[in-house]
Amino acid sequence: MSKIIGIDLGTTNSCVYVMEGKDPKCITNPEGGRTTPSVVAFTDKERLVGEIAKRQAVTNPTRTIFAIKRLMGRKFDSPEVDRWKEHSPYAIVKAPNGDAGVEVDGRTYSSPEISAMILAKLKADAEAYLGETVTEAVITVPAYFNDAQRQATKDAGRIAGLEVKRIINEPTAASLAYGADKKANEKIAVFDLGGGTFDISILEVGDNVVEVRATNGDTFLGGEDFDQRVINFLVEEFKKENGIDLSKDSMALQRLKEAAEKAKKDLSTSMETEVNLPFITADQNGPKHMLVKISRAKLESLVGDLVESTTEPCKKALADAGMTADQIDEVILVGGMTRMPLVQQVVGKFFGKEPNRSVNPDEVVAMGAAIQGGILSGDVKDVLLLDVTPLSLGIETMGGVFTRLIERNTTIPTRKSQVFTTASDNQPSVSIHVLQGERPMSADNMTLARFDLAGIPPAPRGVPQIEVSFDIDANGIVNVSAKDMGTGKEQSIKITASSGLSEEDIQKLVREAEAHATDDKKKQELIEARNHADSLIYGTEKSLADLGDKADAAVKSDIETKMADLRKLMEGEDAAAIKTATDELAKASHKLAEQLYQQQAQQTGAAGAQADAGAAEGQPQGNAADDVVDADYTEVKK
């Protein structure tokens, strides 16, 4: 049975863990990092993912996709997408289904498709570490993600070749990693402020049970917004000093983004930092450089309102849980932004206690996902995890009213039913409009699906009995059914296309991903073959130089011919031919090595014979001990 890996698919960085026995283990990437940047880049020749994609972003800003999680499950005309379009260097476009996608080189990619590229990279890293194929995963999402965003995440997993065994909320995963199930009857708040989202979850734990009582948050608040405030400040400072607006220069903005992120991190440990960007732009007078000092106080003044805005969801979550701040026993900080001293101060002040910083905020979510994988596979026993649905679910009723069937913060999985009737005489069918949200009117909430229940017998209004049932699984994904109680006719819908991708789309993308994985493998084999060949050529040339005239002319000529042939093949794309030619050169170089050893052996033998002859001409060899004379000594006293 293959391992179930735990993945934190983050806005800025992603992380993967796996259970080894009873302990979760972080899987590092080939670059040695414990987290991988959630960045995908397209060049003229290839697709790059992770650290290598991030490194080239400055020179390729319009084809480098970052923070794709902010577009997951969102419509193109949503206010959040409008906000992101203002700052995004890459093109955000409207997909045929109305979702927000990204366009690179004339092709439109959906957000699950880009996310799948990141997941495929994490999957490959896990397979390289484990030495076996990985097909199953637990993937985390912000607790406040709606159904469309959860489904988009699940689809991304499928495209990447992963069966997503469970979608788990990030704060819940963090509580598992913290060891909440081992605690004795505690009330815990998990404050999760990451790169793109904010969640607050209130949990009760004890006796191997982790129960989420309430959750709240903002799926469009995180480190990216903090970075943008710093970028805006730097742009304004440069404009004041030089009269040049950098906000329209995509390459300069990418450099500013990297500098802003670094400055923000530096100011978590230092009181002041310096942004030094030489040759940031140029005008008719020559190149321009940026040199700006930022203090921690200045950063806090720039982002203070963002930090304060996290307290309102905290109040709502506590109210929904029926608790007050002073009843919370422990506050756990999760997400890279919680390293910021101002965030820690605001959280400490709100809850009236020092936050717990014992867990690694960048890795704790992936660690918890791996533990959840262990629970599902049976490796981790005696832990019961009870999560909740973050948003209310219901249908549209007469007058455009949103009628809730399942209230927010209901423990999942769950099933609720309610009987409705017709609004007019002889109504032959009813249209079921499924919604998710907290607003009283349907138009203000998010549509999950629409379907019709037809074939209702003619009857006065109010007579037919239509039972509508909602079913939410452990992943927080919704199924809805409607049944005519009189005829027994039933219509149901599993809300699986809310990510914007049909089953046909997903299967097509799965095939593309598999083909790309094959291409990636071929590229890797070609690179390895070239590297091996290059190393062998270097070593062989060095050996020839060391031997000089001592090398056999025929062997030397054969080797030089084979090296020339191999160099020519290395310019091509045929890995198998390079490997064959490398083997041939290796065999020829072995002959050279044998010749070298034979010459050394002959020289050693000749030197030994001369030494023996010298010993024979000298005095006879006796026992060295015979020449040793014992000596007396006298102690001299001063």
Swiss-Prot record:
Residues 627-638 have a biased composition (Acidic residues). InterPro entries: ATPase_NBD, Chaperone_DnaK, Heat_shock_70_CS, HSP70_C_sf, HSP70_peptide-bd_sf, Hsp_70_fam. The keyword Chaperone applies. Transmembrane segments: none annotated. Pfam families: HSP70 (PF00012). GO terms for molecular function: ATP binding; ATP-dependent protein folding chaperone; unfolded protein binding. Coiled coil: none annotated. Induction: By stress conditions e.g. heat shock. Residues 597-638 are annotated as: Disordered. Keywords: ATP-binding, Chaperone, Nucleotide-binding, Phosphoprotein, Stress response. Residues 598-622 have a biased composition (Low complexity). It comes from the Bacteria. The modification Phosphothreonine is found at residue 197. Belongs to the heat shock protein 70 family. Acts as a chaperone. This is Chaperone protein DnaK. It comes from Desulfovibrio desulfuricans (strain ATCC 27774 / DSM 6949 / MB).
